[in-house]
Amino acid sequence: LERYIPRARHVEIQVFGFGDGRAIHLHERDCSIQRRFQKVIEESPAPGLPDDVRRRMADAAVALARQQQYAGAGTVEFIVDARSFEFFFIEMNTRIQVEHPVTEMITGIDLVALQLRLAG
């Protein structure tokens, strides 16, 4: 049974895992503004997201990457109820996404270079 969330937001947490159980998050991107199921605008930090929700989402994303001993850049995606701020896991994209420059701009971290260093 699936839950219907009438005012849903699509929020992603950028993670980077080192392959040995260590992982970090590089903040979130709100990609709720979409047209024909394609992202139009990515915003970071996600506007109006309470700090405690932001922290719990980041903790959940990092825990997933750590538990899997994930190596490299990945994006953990969530649906967030805009009224209650309850969030639900959608999927993890195990690659660098086209939106990675948004994260690079706010963190100053070159994700492609970091991936290459991990691989080398």
Q: Which residue stretches match the model-derived regions?
A:
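ATP-dependent carboxylate activation and anion-phosphoryl transfer catalytic cores
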Residues: E2-G120
